Amino acid sequence: MRVLALSENIYNRNLSRDEPKFKLWRSAGLMLTYQCNAACEFCYYHCSPRKSGLMPVGTCLDAWRSLQTLAGAAAKIHLTGGEPFLHWDHLVEILAKGKEQGLGSVDLLETNGFWATDDGLIADRLKMLVELGVQRLKISVDPFHQEYVDIEPARRLAATAKRILGPDRVLVRWEKYLGDLRFQISNFRLGERERVYVETYRDYPFRFTGRAAGHLAGLFASKPAAAFRGVDCRAGFLGAKGVHIDPYGNVFSGTCSGIILGNIGQIPLQEIWKAFHPGQIELVRILCERGPFGLLEKARSLGYEELPAYADKCHLCTHIRQFLFERHVEPAVIGPADCYAPSASPPGGRMERQ
């Protein structure tokens, strides 16, 4: 199978041999839905029970096929959400069609394990996944998920999956929380939950984008916007190893949710890669040249008021984009609505959890 050459991208063509190139995307996270049984404070995509969207089988297969065109045998597909197991029959149909069409195996399937309440059901589903070519299962276990998901199904799923799939094919993110009931925080008061949030971030840092740029980011905000002057995102866009594709076909670089590089319903993924140039999309150009601080000029002209402090550059970027989204600025790039809070963030930075 022929793999695309770096020179087939329009940005790379005019670069000297030593200049950093726009890398080939080798992985794609296919977000089957924005719907989730949880609404975790650190979710990059604002997933929740109120959300919807379901990636059509054909869209999923097209993305899968396109990634193979891009990366050949190195292509890695993972299925995520939202929570894919909310749509079990749809998930099975995707996997069955992929196998039928010879698209190879799915590298990773993610779940929070909410459904794993019966040993027989777990075994039946895992055996079906093995038969359909899923290589690894990733189970989300952390204080953020355990605010919504009982730990017992996740434990049961992890134990059964390690027995049926083998321990090397089961990833628990994060294993340390699997046996610790202190982190089942659904009944904690706000102050207690916040203490656990802070401890968790210190153990396993994450970006403050999506819902994480709301209340959670406010717990860590310590730097003024000016502290991020000159901190650009060029390396992040050029060096991204993969993309996420949402249920509607929108393509996001890495984990930069809410910044649309293209839509595979309109243009195949490999053509989006070929046409990507960091200077052609205004928002991306500014981020690559100046970072999120560079977005302030336009935002201020429209009435944006800075927060006293931000947690990181992703917090600054997301907060500004939330403001621009609400004013319908660059809607083809700043979207979709699922990736943004449903209402404006007040001065403290909190965004409504939906």
Per-range role (PLM):
Residues 115-122, 146-152:
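Short, flexible/disordered intra-domain loops and linkers
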Residues 2-111, 116-121:
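Conserved alpha-helical substructure of the radical SAM core
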Residues 36, 40-43, 254-256, 314-317:
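Short cysteine clusters
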Residues 15, 258-354:
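Flexible mid-to-C-terminal extensions adjoining Fe-S/redox cofactors in radical SAM and related proteins
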Residues 25-27, 72-76, 104-106, 132-136, ...:
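A general structural motif
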Residues 127-267, 271-275:
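Radical SAM enzyme [4Fe-4S]-AdoMet core and its adjacent flexible, acidic
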Residues 17, 227-232, 301-304:
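Short, P/G- and charge-enriched loop/turn segments at secondary-structure junctions
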